[in-house]
Amino acid sequence: MEVKGQLISSPTFTAPAALFGEAAPLVKSDRLRGLLDRQRALQEALSVKLQELRKVCLQEAELTGQLPPECPLEPGERPQLVRRRPPAARAYPPPHPNPAHHSLCPAEELALEALEREVSVQQQIAAAARRLALAPDLNGEQRRRRRQVQVDALRRLHELEEQLRDFRARLGLPVLQPLPLSAGALVNAQGVCLGTRLAQLSQEDVVLHSESSSLSESGASHDNEEPHSCFPLTERPSPPKAWDQFRAVSGGSPERRAPWKPPPSDIYGDLKSRRNSVASPTSPTRSLPRSASSFEGRSVPATPVLTRGSGPRLCKPEGLHSRQWSGSQDSQMGFPRPDPASDRASLFAARTRRSNSSEALLVDRAAAGGAGSPPAPLAPPAAGPPVCKSSEVLYERPQPVPSFSSRTTGPPDPPRAARPSSAAPASRGAPRLPTVCGDFLLDYPLDRGLPRGSGGAGWGELLPAPEVPGPLSRRDGLLAMLPGPPPIYAADGSSPLLRSKDPNTRAIRSKPSGLPPEAVEGLEVHPNPLLWMPPPTRIPPAGERGGHKNLALEGLRDWYIRNSGLAVGPQRRPMLPHVGPTHTPFLHARCYEVGQSLYGPPSQAPLPHSRSFTAPPVSGRYGGAFTDG
């Protein structure tokens, strides 16, 4: 049981005692004693609080002169009369003599105080600038700069004081004279005003500047005369250059800057350095990444890197789609350009890349033209270094003994000391008959790299219908499809294949023999009639085009087998029993003649079929296309 926060425990209050009234007087006395004690404590606390409130009210009455009604009074007590205490003496600013000053609004007073504060700060800045300008051990340049800083500080102070005077005059306040600084920068002992001092400093600065400029023009300066200098002679910054001169030196933006061109000795230098280098920096095309074989000692022939990126091209068939063209080997050559110099630069950049087996595929092919018209020859290269200097395939001086080497199917590589380089330039001796390029991709379909168009003469117009073949490859001997003599050599002994290499020879246009006069008339003959063929009249379907890709891979595998030493010697390709006659007598004779000129004397057998390719030979697969209907 709880009574005003007090608990009555069981010993003091029990049910039988409450019921029967046996202990009632004792319980009542205890409860009354507790309540009285509590009342006495509360009364004491209340009296203390009332005394505090009384003091506060009396203090308020002394300030206001009136006793507040909240002041506690004893019963029957009258309100006390309290006299107002006089106010304490406080330090107030002296009243301004002008009565208009008391009528300023708070905004005007704040603006006036801010302007006066700014003037005071600027006075301190001017005094510090004067002390720095008068410091000893200063050379001419430092003294001139500090004088200039002092003049600027004084000019700013003069402007602020003018603003303060105008503002006070507008408010009707008396204009105050500028207070003198401790160092006497504004008003010195003689009473020189600010304007006079500012004019003197400006005149001194002009005189000092003219003296320094005259000394710099005559070749002398204050820095050479005084021992204390800001910068040593070797560390002083160079004078600023004109903007036009800076643009002429820097070349402007990187897009307009002329590309860096290495000297000819670096471009046509050592074959080893060219083998490990990327494309020439003057090449507008992208450089090809180097294969991993260059870091392995080239024990295994490098895999040709085929790019599908876009870039300038020298020749591209018109009817061939750009995506299909970008996948071919000739996509690394580029489109034709009207400028012969740009064609030569692009061709050189494309042929100075990694010298792999794909470099042998970079032959001059058709540019723009009709379906049957042979492509126009490229512009003759200008005089200069040879355009094509491959380190593996093409050489200007082959060995006279035709034999198979470890890298090409043509003549063996000349020794490294005999190869053309910048250290030992090639001497122009008696003209020799150079051999044709080796390492042809024999099963690469010819219709991929030939132009297609709507107009012009095709095979159907140049050959009889039974002799028109289907989609064939170079392995079938169709390099000599058109009748005519073997490759025509120029008077100086240069080959049509290597004509673009020699800068001193001009491209010789020859008419293909064996054609009718009306077919020959008006045709632009390719520089190499042996490698050019009109396109087939039948476009192979998608399935055969996929087979042509397999044939291209087969040619690459043949190249690997020949160069890795797996093939002991040339073997004759076996004839399958179910295959009929391969070629007509005309085609057989021409193929034999071309094979003899390309791969050696008749005693040697043609190139072997790939050992890793399980399909029948190409001649067997396309045997029906060569037979007379």
Swiss-Prot record:
CC terms in the record's Gene Ontology section: centriolar subdistal appendage; centriole; endosome; growth cone
GO annotation terms (biological process): microtubule anchoring at centrosome; protein localization
Segment forming the signal sequence: none
PTM per Swiss-Prot/TrEMBL: Ubiquitinated; interaction with CYTH2 may prevent ubiquitination.
Positions of the UniProt region annotated as Disordered: 209-356, 399-432, 602-629
UniProt keyword DNA damage present: no
Highest taxon in the source lineage: Eukaryota
Keyword Ubl conjugation: yes
Keywords: Cell projection, Coiled coil, Cytoplasm, Cytoskeleton, Developmental protein, Endosome, Methylation, Phosphoprotein, Ubl conjugation
Broad class of where this protein is predominantly found: cytoplasm
Sites bearing Phosphoserine, chain numbering: 355, 357
Any matching Pfam family: CUPID
Residues the record lists as Omega-N-methylarginine modifications: 432
Polar residues: compositionally biased ranges: 323-332
Compartments where found: Cytoplasm, Cytoskeleton, Microtubule organizing center, Centrosome, Centriole; Cytoplasm; Cell projection, Neuron projection; Cell projection, Growth cone
Comp. bias regions, Low complexity: 209-219, 279-294, 418-432
Ranges for region Involved in CYTH2-binding: 31-70
Recorded coiled-coil stretches: 109-173
Described function: Centriolar protein required for centriole subdistal appendage assembly and microtubule anchoring in interphase cells. Together with CCDC68, cooperate with subdistal appendage components ODF2, NIN and CEP170 for hierarchical subdistal appendage assembly. Recruits NIN and CEP170 to centrosomes. Also required for neurite growth. Localizes CYTH2 to vesicles to allow its transport along neurites, and subsequent ARF6 activation and neurite growth.
Subunit (UniProt): Interacts with NIN and CEP170; leading to recruit them to centrosomes. Interacts with CYTH2; this interaction is direct and stabilizes CCDC120, possibly by preventing ubiquitination.
PANTHER family in the record: COILED-COIL DOMAIN-CONTAINING PROTEIN 120, COILED-COIL DOMAIN-CONTAINING PROTEIN 120 FAMILY MEMBER
Protein known as: Coiled-coil domain-containing protein 120
